Amino acid sequence: MRTVELTPRLRSVAELVPRGARFADVGTDHAYLPVWLLQQGRITGAVASDLRPGPLERARGTAEKYGLTGRMDFRLCDGLSGIQPDEVNTIAIAGMGGETIAAILAAAPWTWERECLLLLQPMSAQPFLRRWLQAHGYTIRRELLSREGDTLYTTFEVYAGPMAKLTPAELWAGRQTRG
């Protein structure tokens, strides 16, 4: 069977998903990420959510094309509003702005309370999101860079817990870590 090909941007998110995760893809669009993770055996099921019917239908189409509709749930909802806290422990929110990602997390405090792994890939407002995460008790464990064409993307690996205060430079560029 054919497998979905991930772009470098989505592959950087996929690399951070732990084996056996209960996974949600917020703003799934085509559902390439959860389909690839299922094909690789990294996860056993997924919740794919989107705010608009069109992208959610494309997601269903992708899952159907690869024979995975029985292993995925599709939710038409705003952010995490249609996902119950006990359904997932790993959440990807990629392809939207940092302010939108912060608003989604603010509306779902259970992501912090249940210590979910958050894989965040803001397309804009990265300094805003770093500041918001720090102020709301999350820690960025690491950041991965990926490149597609001339564009660089940053993926944040985020957990609940206090983060050392970021300097103004770190708010803009991220904290440099080894490994």
Question: Each predicted region: which residue ranges?
Answer:
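Conserved SAM/SAH-binding beta-strand->alpha-helix loop
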Residues: R52-G54
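Conserved SAM-binding loop of SAM-dependent methyltransferases across substrates and taxa
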Residues: H30-I43
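Conserved class I S-adenosyl-L-methionine
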Residues: G20-D29
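Short SAM/SAH-binding signature in class I
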Residues: E87-G95
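Class I S-adenosyl-L-methionine
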Residues: R2-L6, S81-G82, E87, E99-G179
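S-adenosyl-L-methionine
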Residues: M1-A21, V35, E57-D86
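Conserved SAM-binding motif I beta-strand of class I
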Residues: G45-D50
